[in-house]
Amino acid sequence: MAISAALILAAGKGTRMKSALVKVLHELAGRPMLGWPLAAAREAGAGQIVIVAGHQADQVQKRFGADAGIRIALQEEQLGTGHAVSCSLDQLDGLSGAVLILCGDTPLLTAATLQRLAAEHAASGAAVTVLTAKLDRPFGYGRIVRDSEGRVRRIVEQKDASPEEQAIDEVNSGIYCMELEFLRSHIGRLGSENAQNEYYLTDLVGIAVAEHAGCSAVVADDPDEIMGVNDRVQLAHAARVLRQRVNLQLMLAGVTLIDPDQTYIDADVQVGNDTIIWPGCVLRGATSIGSGCTLENNVRVSDCVIADRVQLKAGSVLSEAQVAEDVSVGPMAHLRPGSVLQAQVKIGNFVETKKVVMGTGSKASHLTYLGDAEIGSDVNIGCGTITCNYDGRHKHKTVIGDGVFVGSDVQLVAPVTVGANALIAAGTTVTQDVPPDSLAIARTPQVNKTGWCLKKRDNG
């Protein structure tokens, strides 16, 4: 069934989160909470997306407003779900047919469930179709009241429910599929004569029944899908469920997770088959990992492109880096933004790079800082080497040609260029360009004072 649009209600502040950030922008598995029902609606086939924002609407606009398929409606005063929907209808001018109404704080909702909801809506011919769930502890949710034949008659909110109604275990999810024509013509009939003095969208169910327009229902297979996130405990639970879903899909696609419960992978991360990921790894953002890679314990990767057969050894941290095939990084290495490692590069323990291009086969095996540098192929960077790229005001570039050998404890004071196949002696501070095929040595000559230590001891 075609879905004309989806309305996502996201105007609430989320007081129980006890946060300066509006609830729906809290992150789960690499996306803001609101991004999850939005993605589900799109995958289910919704055309236009309308977000109803209220608290921190400017932040919601900043995060989602640049998307051409999303419109933002403003609910300046929060007077209930019915009022929220009424604030959004002018964004749907010119549309007809079915519309999904979702909650911005239900990140576990899936596209498959929305498709079931839309299919039932089309098959039943009802004006309103509601997604429900059966809960062992339904406190706080609106209850689904059915007649003796099992037909939905109305939804009663917790604060307005009688003791008998509170005993009902089938609850309203706050998620609906409605006919736009019915919604437009009846939203103005909602009243606020209830315990919360709000305009309940749920009252449209009773109106639809009373006018014989029809109300249908779909029971969610997994009650977790309708869970609203209202505090940090529920946020952690939802994040755990999403992480399990992400990890399950990766394992089914041929990725080995040694301990899935201790592996944290954002939803938009891509990982190739035959890659092995050890516990404690965190993969974030728009990261892409190739096939046949190994990520040892406690590796963190954010917004990186990693090619095939790369070894990321324990404790390494990579951010906004590009790593070609057959590269080895770590252990305990740090690739900062702008690091580009070409094929067969080796970055060893306690090596830090930033804004560096390292050519094919080059190595920096130990205890090195490389920043603002262009390094050719088959270069050896000795232990303790530093590119001195910052003069206190500006950054400067170091260029090292192909085949250069840099000895241990070398400082390259930028801007400086080292020509191809040159050799920099250990302990040298390079302050001038080095011609190709040359030896550069700049250190005080060694002086041995024979017997000096004996004299020092004898003199006390």
From Swiss-Prot:
Its main location: cytoplasm. It holds the Pfam family Hexapep. The keyword Lyase does not apply. Signal peptide: none annotated. InterPro entries: Bifunctional_GlmU, GlmU-like, GlmU_C_LbH, Hexapep, Hexapep_transf_CS, MobA-like_NTP_Trfase, Nucleotide-diphossugar_trans, Trimer_LpxA-like_sf. Mg(2+) binds at residues 105, 230. Its EC number is 2.7.7.23, 2.3.1.157. It is found in: Cytoplasm. UDP-N-acetyl-alpha-D-glucosamine binds at residues 9-12, 23, 75, 80-81, 142, 157, 172, 230, 336, 354, 369, 380. It is an enzyme of class 2 (transferase). PROSITE patterns: HEXAPEP_TRANSFERASES. Its cofactor is Mg(2+). The active site is at 366 (proton acceptor). One of its GO terms (biological process) is cell wall organization. Residues 1-232 are annotated as: Pyrophosphorylase. Binds 1 Mg(2+) ion per subunit. One of its GO terms (cellular component) is cytoplasm. Residues 233-253 are annotated as: Linker. Keywords: Acyltransferase, Cell shape, Cell wall biogenesis/degradation, Cytoplasm, Magnesium, Metal-binding, Multifunctional enzyme, Nucleotidyltransferase, Peptidoglycan synthesis, Repeat, Transferase. Homotrimer. Catalyzes the last two sequential reactions in the de novo biosynthetic pathway for UDP-N-acetylglucosamine (UDP-GlcNAc). The C-terminal domain catalyzes the transfer of acetyl group from acetyl coenzyme A to glucosamine-1-phosphate (GlcN-1-P) to produce N-acetylglucosamine-1-phosphate (GlcNAc-1-P), which is converted into UDP-GlcNAc by the transfer of uridine 5-monophosphate (from uridine 5-triphosphate), a reaction catalyzed by the N-terminal domain. In the N-terminal section; belongs to the N-acetylglucosamine-1-phosphate uridyltransferase family. In the C-terminal section; belongs to the transferase hexapeptide repeat family. This is Bifunctional protein GlmU. It comes from Trichlorobacter lovleyi (strain ATCC BAA-1151 / DSM 17278 / SZ) (Geobacter lovleyi). The lineage of its organism: Bacteria, Pseudomonadati, Thermodesulfobacteriota, Desulfuromonadia, Geobacterales. The gene is glmU.
